[in-house]
Amino acid sequence: DCSSDVCSSDLSDITIRNATLADAPRILEIYAYYVEHTVITFEYDVPSLAEFEGRMRDIMKKYPYLVIERDGRIEGYAYAHAFVGRAAYDWAAELTIYLDHDVRRGGLGRVLYEALADRLKAMGVLNLYACIGYPLVEDEYLTRNSAQFHEHLGFTLAGTFHNCGYKFGRWYDMIWMEKIIGEHRPDQPDIVPYQY
């Protein structure tokens, strides 16, 4: 169970914990690889550390921002943020996950994403969304691995935006995937902001 502040899973040497701003340099190092070498993010330029810390601060006002560590080294991170900045969307959250490019496909992503979903469910979030770059033909910048990862976790395709992202001289689709994790009621209680 990964619903507490610290989580140990069947991967005995890993820990999941809340991120802090002190983690920002390592988290940014992980993210920078994807900006510079992939279309997993549509961002062109690696943000400055100050800008990245500001993004983290904004997310942490309401949502969980988690890191996964192995032997004390951050190997990945995941967070949720507002799906759309309007009150009627409060029960929906967009999720983001990045693992160090050298440690993918070891089960860390699944454990980290499930820990994030557990925390969101405890907040009262009902709908999880993922915005994913998607290639018509896989290439050196983008595969379909992210879509397949989400599908294995129970996400389903909600929609496709065709040729909406341009990076490295090529056009890419963007897909939205969703997963419902709670009951939609006519008297829905408000979500509770995440507590650090």
Residue ranges of each PLM-predicted region?
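Conserved GNAT-fold acetyl-CoA-binding loop/helix
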Residues: L28-R55
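Acetyl-CoA-dependent GNAT
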Residues: V46-D102, Y113-E114, R119, M123, ...
